[in-house]
Design a protein with these regions (language model features):
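N-terminal pre-domain/capping segments
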Residues: 1-104, 136, 171, 272-333
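Histidine-acidic metal/acid-base catalytic patches
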Residues: 2, 18-25, 159-173, 184-333
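Hydrophobic faces of well-ordered beta-strands that scaffold small-molecule active sites
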Residues: 3-8, 32-34, 61-67, 107-109, ...
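Active-site beta-loop-alpha junctions enriched in small/polar residues
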Residues: 6-10, 35-39, 68-72, 112-114, ...
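Loop/helix-junction capping segments adjacent to catalytic residues or to phosphate/diphosphate-binding pockets
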Residues: 14, 42-46, 156-160, 184-187
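Surface-exposed, active-site-proximal loop segments in enzymatic domains
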Residues: 41-47, 69-90, 113-126, 216-223, ...
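Charged helix-capping and loop-helix junction motifs
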Residues: 45-51, 85, 89-92, 124-135, ...
Length: 333
């Protein structure tokens, strides 16, 4: 397992792709995951993409990449008209070709942001079905290029929904990008979810998190890897058993997210929620509250008062410091 980071962690610093690769090298990391090919070159210029690939290879770094969302409902909303599955797939094909030109075999993608599940104009199930239709349109291209789309646990899909999507579209063209911290945002028991997803995981976003009780239910905040309540060593062990060559890409960011589980209307958007999963998340919140009370863990609002550009590098360094020995142990298994 090699240890890298997702460019989103330092996107606010305005580094070019070349500078981001050097940043990884200078900070002892082994690779970079970028948002999508257009973040390397807006025109998907083959020469420009080839230059980034050559630099990564020269520095001995792995290069990972994502795609624009295959959810056509998001694009329809942006353009104010209905975009068909065939049209959206045709727009994504040049991005897939760019992914292949970078030497990548997998491309991260997300179905929705944290708001899409709760939209009143288009149901979440309709959005997932529309996304599946786009991905089916892309099957021949993916097979021809030898690529898989690795759909992320992106504060949108539950584990059940993601596994069904992989099954419906086909394991030969679809996999998973596992975000370790986001699992709790969709009310999944993180360890159980990771164990179920592990056989399909192709890419990662490794982050920790904390949970707190609020008058509306819960709040969620990312934390440096190893400093929160995600059962990280157990999750990483499950991933290592399934794929010892998996890259681990650290992804960290600011902000506190609201999880109003006391609101029946909000909770109704999780019709298949298992009591055991919700109980696992609430138990982790209780663990956090105990640590807040004893002073061994800072409350989310205290941490969030610190500007992100003041804590980003420290968080990254702490995450690397935690993961290095863990990866070393897992690599020896």
């Amino acid at each position: 397992m090699r240890l890298g980071f997702d460019h989103y962690t330092i996107a606010h610093r305005g580094l070019t792709p070349e500078q981001a690769l050097w940043f990884a090298r200078e900070h002892g990391l082994e690779g970079v995951q970028f948002l999508e090919p257009a973040s390397l070159d807006a025109d998907l210029d083959p020469g420009r993409l080839a230059a980034v690939r050559r630099q990564a290879e020269a520095l001995g770094l792995f290069l990972e990449i994502g795609l624009p969302s295959p959810n056509p409902v998001r694009l329809s909303r942006q353009e104010g008209r209905e975009v068909s599955a065939a049209e959206h797939a045709s727009r994504l094909r040049p991005h897939l070709e760019a992914v292949a030109s970078l030497g990548c075999r997998d491309a991260r993608a997300y179905v929705g942001d944290r708001h899409d599940r709760f939209r009143s104009d288009v149901s979440w199930s309709s959005q997932v079905a529309a996304t599946a239709a786009v991905l089916r349109e892309l099957r021949p291209t993916l097979l021809d290029l030898g690529l898989k789309v690795a759909v992320e646990t992106h504060a949108d899909l539950t584990t059940d929904e993601l596994l069904k999507l992989v099954s419906d579209v086909g394991e030969d063209v679809l996999g998973v990008t596992l975000d370790t911290g986001n699992l709790l945002m969709r009310l999944d028991d993180p360890l159980r979810a990771a164990e179920r997803l592990a056989p399909h995981v192709r890419m990662t976003h490794v982050k920790d998190c904390v949970i707190a009780f609020t008058p509306r239910g819960l709040s969620w905040q990312a934390r440096p890897v190893g400093s929160g309540v995600v059962p990280m060593t157990d999750i990483l062990a499950a991933l290592a058993r399934a794929n010892p060559a998996l890259n681990l890409s650290i992804e960290l960011h600011p902000r506190i997210y609201d999880l109003p589980i006391f609101d029946p209307g909000w909770l109704a958007h999780f019709p298949a929620l298992r009591p055991s999963d919700l109980a696992a998340v609430v138990r982790l919140a209780a663990d956090c509250e105990r640590k807040y009370a004893e002073g061994s863990l800072q409350r989310p609002e205290v941490v969030e008062a610190i500007p992100w550009d003041v804590r980003d590098l420290e968080w990254l360094a702490r995450s690397v410091g935690y993961l290095r020995p863990v990866v070393g142990i897992l690599s020896g298994l």
